């Protein structure tokens, strides 16, 4: 789409929003029901698209994309009326007689820019929240996952008129045109580099943003952890979607006392989950494109390999890799991996672990495996991170009952459930003043008596 076409689309959404149709709860509920029914009707098409773009198997696609989207819609259908209600708050005595309340109101016209790694979920879930909050939306899926982008466009065009919700496909040129436009809110999921560009463009219009970014999410394995279970859950979280998950354990810090034993468990568990020949496993995914394939291969230090390392260039598949005796100076520790490589570093001192993690950008996620409540409290209290798990990985984002988001370099803002509704909602603070009483203290001319009265109320 050209700049003028995008501007025309945005203008049509502004006009539609100004008409007030999206303010009604029934309108929002009907829209969500339409979307839910369409997703169910196109489930096979969605699965096929995800297989084409990322090599995902059907169970993983439903568990991590379609099912979570349907769950978010169901949650909003159950709660949206309550979320929309005005909330009465206490009124100061000095403002007697009046009623004070907070009125949730949609921002208006929002832009949702989504990534390629979970292209269906990370497009639809923020859209669900935006619709529930009463906004119109323009959705821009990633050009790197074209098959999924097309099915998203088909579903949305079947459910909604473009003046309500529309999809813009394309690449960098379309992204630039969209970011040059004046939206009321921008929701972006992707890399830090592009996130900075989004924020720069948003600043030109003073547009509020949510940035869901990433980072090197650490996984700490204490000496008292259930090592076998820790290995199982870390392997699941790391190699899901071939490691292309923003909250995947990026690296493991394992206490030296149990280091050798844990490495052995990791190796056995990886083989158990993916087989001796993972490149022949139809449920194991692929890297999104050749650029990322080559980047990931460049991070492997073959002198430190414990497992894996083989690849299929034609199919863009890399075996699950485990690397041992990694240091913070190694190439694999200089950037977010975003692929099926798991570096395992030994540690000796809790304080050194805390200091090392805090010396870098705040991670999007943190995972700690331990049975010591004091150790868990120390780690989760003294390290800044977006969210995480104790004795598990990645499952903290698979719920609508609490928000998900980053902090510092891993992003700003949150969504899912109530947090998602609030993200796309401006809360108007309103005082409804009665007319049968008008206290004179605030009006000029001032007097010593009025001053005493004011000081009595305001202290």
Segments from the language model and where they lie:
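N-terminal Rossmann-like NAD(P)+-binding subdomain of aldehyde/semialdehyde dehydrogenases
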Residues: 1-101
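Residues at or immediately preceding the N-termini of alpha-helices
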Residues: 6, 25, 43, 227, ...
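Conserved C-terminal structural/oligomerization subdomain of aldehyde/semialdehyde dehydrogenase
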Residues: 24, 220, 271, 317-459
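Short loop/edge segments at beta-strand edges and connector loops
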Residues: 84, 169, 307-309
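Rossmann-like NAD(P) dinucleotide-binding subdomain of oxidoreductase/dehydrogenase enzymes
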Residues: 93-229
């Amino acid at each position: 789409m050209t700049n003028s076409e995008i501007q025309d689309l945005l203008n049509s959404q502004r006009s539609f929003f100004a008409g007030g149709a999206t303010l009604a709860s029934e309108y929002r509920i009907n829209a969500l029901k339409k979307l839910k029914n369409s997703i169910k009707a196109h489930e096979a098409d969605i699965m096929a698209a995800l297989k084409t773009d990322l090599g995902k198997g059907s169970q993983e696609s439903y568990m991590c994309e379609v099912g979570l989207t349907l769950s978010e819609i169901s949650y909003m259908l159950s709660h949206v009326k309550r979320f929309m209600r005005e909330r009465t708050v206490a009124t100061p005595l000095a403002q007697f007689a009046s009623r004070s309340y907070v009125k949730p109101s949609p921002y208006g016209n929002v832009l949702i820019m989504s990534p390629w790694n979970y292209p269906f979920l990370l497009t639809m879930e923020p859209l669900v929240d935006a619709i529930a909050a009463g906004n119109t939306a323009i959705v821009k899926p990633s050009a790197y996952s074209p098959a999924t982008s097309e099915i998203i466009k088909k579903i949305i065009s079947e459910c909604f008129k473009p003046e309500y919700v529309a999809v813009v496909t394309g690449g960098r040129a379309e992204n630039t045109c969209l970011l040059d436009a004046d939206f009321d809110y921008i929701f972006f999921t992707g890399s830090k580099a592009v996130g900075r560009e989004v924020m720069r463009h948003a600043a030109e219009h003073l547009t509020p943003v949510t940035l869901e970014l990433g980072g090197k999410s650490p996984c700490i394995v204490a000496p008292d952890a259930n090592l076998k279970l820790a290995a199982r859950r870390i392997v699941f979280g790391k190699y899901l979607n071939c490691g292309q998950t923003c909250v995947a354990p990026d690296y493991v810090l394992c206490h030296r006392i149990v280091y050798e034993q844990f490495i052995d468990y990791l190796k056995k568990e990886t083989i158990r989950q993916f087989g001796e020949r993972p490149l022949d496993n139809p449920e194991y995914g692929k890297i999104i494109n050749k650029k990322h394939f080559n980047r990931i291969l460049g991070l492997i230090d073959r002198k430190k390999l414990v497992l894996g390392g083989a690849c299929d260039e034609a199919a863009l598949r890399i075996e699950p890799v485990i690397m041992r005796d990694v240091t913070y100076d190694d190439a694999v520790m200089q950037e977010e991996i975003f692929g099926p490589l798991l570096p395992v570093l030994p540690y000796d001192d809790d304080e050194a672990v805390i200091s090392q993690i805090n010396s870098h950008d705040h991670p999007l996620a943190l995972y700690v495996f331990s049975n010591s409540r004091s150790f868990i409290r120390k780690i989760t209290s003294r390290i800044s991170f977006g969210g995480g798990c104790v004795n598990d990985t990645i499952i903290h984002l698979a719920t609508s009952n609490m928000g998900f988001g980053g902090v510092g370099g891993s992003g700003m803002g949150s969504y899912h459930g109530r947090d998602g509704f609030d993200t796309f909602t401006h809360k108007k603070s309103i005082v409804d003043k009665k007319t049968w009483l008008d206290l004179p203290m605030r009006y000029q001319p001032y007097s010593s008596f009025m001053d005493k009265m004011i000081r009595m109320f305001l202290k």
